[in-house]
A protein has these predicted regions:
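N-terminal localization/anchoring segments of enzymes in phospholipid and broader phosphate metabolism
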Residues: 1-340, 345, 349, 389, ...
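Short, solvent-exposed amphipathic alpha-helical segments in soluble enzyme
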Residues: 294, 370-374, 400
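NAD(P)-dependent dehydrogenases' Rossmann-like dinucleotide-binding region
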Residues: 351, 356-361
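Thr-Gly-centered strand-to-loop micro-motif
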Residues: 357-358, 385, 415, 434-435
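Helical hairpin unit composed of two closely spaced alpha helices linked by a short loop
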Residues: 360-382, 386, 391
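Histidine/acidic-residue-rich catalytic or RNA/ligand-binding cores of hydrolases
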Residues: 366-368, 395-397, 426-427
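Catalytic-core elements of nucleic-acid end-processing and repair enzymes
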Residues: 423
């Protein structure tokens, strides 16, 4: 809260000065109104052309075209600061500068027995090439159907750490969970281990302030915020939504769980909190180590610290033991959103079923079309959503997409005990994903995310069983639940236009 108050005290005087300056400017420029109007119209015309030519999702384009055509000058300025990905170029330069060092080398995908045919091989080759991260043997993988089960194991692995512990989370919030974890981290730092914590400045704006950071640093823990929130630099977008814990480069945790009490159902402000996650050991942890170090070196002033050695993964054995995993991070700086395209591709390959967990449902048109096409082919497409929302407006926006999906044969379920925060996908008993990617525009196109694709791993059966178990506690949304009133139809249309901003 102190962090928010401090920033408000800075922003309000600055905004007041800007308003005063604009009033004086308007008075001075009054005689030139006609010329200014013409100039603004010409500028708006070129902005519209620029947006039309840009390679972006069409829903996003339509939103900004409406804003700029309705309010030419403020709309154009708003787009430059909040809608234009060029503001993220400094982030991209910092990341590219450090990414080349220590990248895990890709495996020989040709050695993987693709019983599903050539198409899955193409998908994995594309994902390797697109993200720069390798397909690896999954080895020992543990699935977590709740954060309640995941947190104790995380603490135990931290206690067993011998060399380093790295944490990167969107939200860190002091409470029973974080306080117990921080105590263990402080003890490990006192033993001389390399402890690093990275958190997103916007995601933790109301929960984790500089006092918390100074407390960690005073105990020997290195702690940095990702992309500090500075409105004039357009950093509201391009947040670090990734979630990972790496211990000694040998064990890694990821999934939807942040470091706050509600994620382990210690507190239940939105009913029962349903999440998913996993633990991997051995070679797959190397990808997470590299993902963390890439961001740490790009955004920490301490990037001259010695880095742990990344081991080159061995080629997979010809026979499948526990399948394969490909862990990667997605970036808003990419021309093609990796996770969005991956889900479109996997939906096109599905023959039996394709099931999603997601807390928010505001996908782009291409992903909506892919879901509809799969349902038309007879694929059982299901989506589990929250029954109790954490953000009512976002939930209302998500529901505005229900009708379009239900009429195409997609089944939607709402989790009546509480809130679903899981971000997972499973299809045909063959492939699944677990990560941080929500099915909304911000997550698919504007945030840094991490995701893990599992192929023919035992975790897929566990994910499927968990989906069915969760579905049994859900209410299925029926077409008659979505009233076709004219007012609702208009409201839904407006909400869908503005969905990319939420």
């Amino acid at each position: 809260m102190k962090k928010i108050v401090r920033r408000i005290l800075i922003v309000i005087p600055a905004a007041a000065l800007q308003v005063l300056w604009l009033l004086l400017l308007v008075k001075w420029l009054a005689p030139y109104t006609a010329l200014i109007t013409l100039t603004m119209s010409v500028a708006a015309f070129f902005f519209v052309l620029y947006i039309i030519i840009k390679r972006e999702e069409r829903t996003y384009k339509i939103l900004w075209l409406l804003v700029i055509l309705t309010f030419p000058l403020p709309g154009a300025l708003f787009y430059l600061f909040f809608g234009n990905k060029r503001t993220a170029k400094p982030l991209g330069k910092r990341l590219e500068k450090v990414k080349e060092a220590g990248t895990p080398k890709p495996l020989c995908i040709g050695a993987v027995p693709f019983d599903g045919g050539h198409r899955m091989e193409q998908t994995l080759r594309w994902l390797e090439r697109k993200t720069g991260y390798p397909l690896m043997r999954a080895g020992q993988v543990r699935y977590y159907a709740l954060g309640d089960d995941m947190m104790p194991d995380m603490l135990e692995d931290i206690k067993r750490a011998r060399s380093f512990v790295y944490l990167e989370y969107f939200i860190i919030e002091p409470g029973r969970l974080w306080d117990s974890m921080a105590a263990v981290l402080e003890d490990k730092a006192a033993q001389g281990l390399d402890i690093r914590v990275m958190y997103d400045d916007l995601g933790s704006i109301s929960t984790f302030n500089m006092d918390n950071v100074r407390q960690l640093r005073s105990k020997g823990i290195k702690c940095v915020p990702f992309n500090p929130l500075i409105a004039v630099k357009g950093t509201v977008n391009y947040r670090d939504h990734r979630k990972m814990l790496i211990v000694d480069g040998e064990t890694a945790y990821s999934g939807g769980v942040n470091l706050a009490d509600r994620y382990a159902n210690i507190e239940q402000p939105y009913g029962h909190w349903k999440d998913t996650g996993f633990r991997v050991t051995g070679e797959p942890a190397q990808s997470f180590t590299h993902m963390f170090l890439t961001f740490w070196n790009a955004f920490s002033l301490q990037n001259n610290l010695p880095q742990p050695e990344l081991k080159e993964p061995r080629l997979p054995a010809p026979e499948i033991e526990n399948g394969y995993i490909l862990s990667y991070y997605d970036s808003p700086l990419n021309r093609e959103a990796s996770s969005n395209q991956l889900y479109i591709d996997l939906l096109s390959q599905s023959t039996d079923y394709a099931w999603f967990f997601t807390p928010y449902l505001m996908p782009g048109d291409e992903l909506l079309d892919a879901m509809a096409c799969a349902a038309h082919r007879g694929v059982d497409v299901r989506i589990i959503m929250p029954g109790i929302p954490d953000k009512k407006l976002i939930f209302r926006m998500s529901r505005s997409f229900y009708q379009a999906l239900l009429t195409e044969g997609v089944k939607i379920y709402e989790y009546t005990p509480g809130f679903v925060h899981a971000k997972s996908f499973v299809s045909d008993d063959v492939v699944g994903t677990i990560g941080t990617v929500n099915l909304d525009y911000r997550s698919l196109f504007l945030h840094f995310e991490n995701n893990s694709l599992f192929y023919r791993s035992n975790i897929i059966a566990e994910l499927k069983d968990d989906f069915l178990s969760t579905q049994a506690k859900c209410r299925q949304v029926q077409p008659y639940d979505i009233k076709h009133y004219a007012v609702r139809w208009i409201v839904d249309g407006i909400l869908r236009i503005f969905a990319p901003l939420c």
